[in-house]
């Protein structure tokens, strides 16, 4: 039995039309007939579902697919919010790492499959129709592998280490100056490494270090900053100046530090320039000795103390004598080239009595004197052979040991010097304190006197070898004169020995 829509209620007909519009079905409303009551029940259910939606939304929507899209968008927005809440930063980082690792593994497996397949075909000698040979293919594939993140980090590390090594080797050059040299070396024709080293070795501070005038490059820079170095007779305060062939480098003359020209004239007035070198040295030495004798007359008391503190402490050739002719605080400059002094002091010397027959020694309370030699030859002879106190110039009983049978002068000398330091305190307390400090060190240095003499003899022999080594290790790219304290720069060195490995061509990539 066919039922037309006209027989139904008007409300049900409207619902059916809206359903047809939503389902995009092309059906004539007039031709539709409901054969069973089940269809009516379906319409009622659809009615309830449609009424649940908002009326405004149903009027605006013309297609059921648009409604589905809107629902999906709403679900995505809600799902994103849930994702942010559920995952923390640590889980995100782990998730991203796992993604990267999986992608790398996929690429690695693909590359392995390609390589093994090609190698298997080559081994089986099967023909492969490729645009280019297999070796080129494998070579290009290796290039793509090296362009990964790990290879880039290694290159950066090598560049950084290379820069640090060069900075430390050349006295911690600033990065700006090093970058300038690299740019200049790149612009120059020829090899990059040769240009780089030739430019660095032309720097003023490096040249001073190579010449041997300074111990370090930092000391050379300090000398430049203190305006102690001249380049072509002009003050140069910039240590990074690049020299050219023929430039003359010289130190500041010590005579320039003198304020007046009169002092200079007085120094050079007594020297005859027309005489030969040996005669000049003799004339100068005689006139210097005359000047010293004139200064001795001015400051006799201070000179006595200075000579005593400087030379008498390490000399064991002292002798005590009773000379009642001299007065206190008097100095005489005899023809025998000896300085003698007479100082008032009352002292006694105690030596312990024991089974080894030590005796008690007393000194007369008269004006005694200490005498010592000035010149080095006599001092060395006295140090090499330990002299006992002379018998004629003393009123002291000799002490003998059973083991050595020698006179022990050290204890007597030490106690005489302590009393002498006490007598000086009224005159100058500073020198007395210095002398007391030296005396404390003498006990440890008693046996070192003979060792020092051997060192002096060895040093004289070693100086010969040092001079030979200096001639061998003298740089060939510089003309050095120790007499005038000047250097002539000829050219940059042709060979440089580095204590480490450096690949300077890597630095070219960083530019």
UniProtKB/Swiss-Prot annotation:
According to its UniProt entry, one GO biological process term is: ribosomal small subunit biogenesis
What positions does the domain S4 RNA-binding occupy? 202-272
Classification via SUPFAM superfamilies: Alpha-L RNA-binding motif
One of the record's GO molecular function terms: structural constituent of ribosome
InterPro entries given in the database record: Ribosomal_uS4, S4_RNA-bd, S4_RNA-bd_sf
List UniProt keywords, sorted A-Z.
Mitochondrion, Ribonucleoprotein, Ribosomal protein, RNA-binding, rRNA-binding
Subcellular localization, as worded in the UniProt entry = Mitochondrion
Per its record, how is this protein called by name?
Small ribosomal subunit protein uS4m
What family is it from? Belongs to the universal ribosomal protein uS4 family.
What is any one of the record's Gene Ontology cellular component terms?
small ribosomal subunit
Q: Which organism is it from?
A: Prototheca wickerhamii
Q: Does the keyword Transmembrane apply?
A: no
Q: Record's Gene3D superfamilies?
A: Ribosomal Protein S4 Delta 41, Chain A, domain 1, RNA-binding S4 domain
Q: Where are the transmembrane segments?
A: none
**Primary location group:** mitochondrion
